[in-house]
Amino acid sequence: HRGITWPQRFHVTLCGEQRDSILEVNLTDSLCTLPLPFPVRYILPNTDGRGYGLFIPDSHTLPWLLAHWQETADDTAREALLMLLYENYQAKHFTDEEWSSSLLTGLSKEKNPLIASTIIGYLGNPLRTLAFEKKQEMEEAMFRLSETHAIPSCRIQLLRSLIQNATSDRSLQKLYSIWTNQSGKQLNERDYTTLAYILSLRMPEQSKTLLTTQRQRLKNPDRLREFDFISRAVTPDTLELDALFRSLMLAENRRIEPWTATALSYLNHPARESYSIKYIRPALEALLDVQRTGDIFFPKNWVNALLSQHRSPEAYREVEAFFAAHPDYPVLLKNKILQAAYPLYRANKQK
């Protein structure tokens, strides 16, 4: 709320008992008054997607829109309303359960691959934060859609989302079976390698079997070198994890930056969130050296790998303590840290 007005044009759709109408809004001031040409039940803002900002529907429209957005025939309007709802979800105007239910209902009917892809991208947030029973139901619904959805690209995206986000025993057993039998026909070698990494984190008792078998499946020498570098980050052996982290503090061990970022992200995976808090401060202290010795984009990738998966108050305090200890930290790097830590800060705003 900085008192800034963005002059802009966008459509507002008026939904009445007998008909709908689209009005063009020309927003030039902080307040814009529109005439209603007939009795209106629902007012849908920014249905052409051109508007910039958080559009908050009225308290009557928002729950109706959450239940009915997927019935919008026009693809552009449907995508725009989906994005509007996502922004209202981020603003905490409805619950994880309401949002996930709306997304899954929409996904089951969606015929546009781009909109389906947007929906699947949005599923990740509630998958992380839903209560256990509801999360398990959601995972099972996603598995069903990964086998039955009419859009092939949607089926593989769902499976990849489950690989990254599923945590229930039932889901992990399904994924383990897919990995063991290599039965996910849409999955490629990289997908199976990622699945082995994730299962090693989620099922530490199977880690040795997973990593040994997956390594035997790889034939390409470059992929074997990559595997040998990254797989050290998914072992349950904490001494190995700490040794790997210490090695990443040295520039010569960060030469292949995509591998480094992937390893750092697995070191800070949600499956070991409480353990990895101790990595936050030293990795932030190393950021200036990362900038000095690496590619121009590497500092951003480094802090994303380090912070983007953390949500705990302890992790939040580590970042705050770093800033308190470095009041004159370079602004560009500080902003990169804050951008990567945005989900962490959101999760701890009220705490």
Predicted regions and their residues:
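Non-catalytic accessory/interaction domains
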Residues: H1-E226, R232-V234, T238-L241, R246-K351
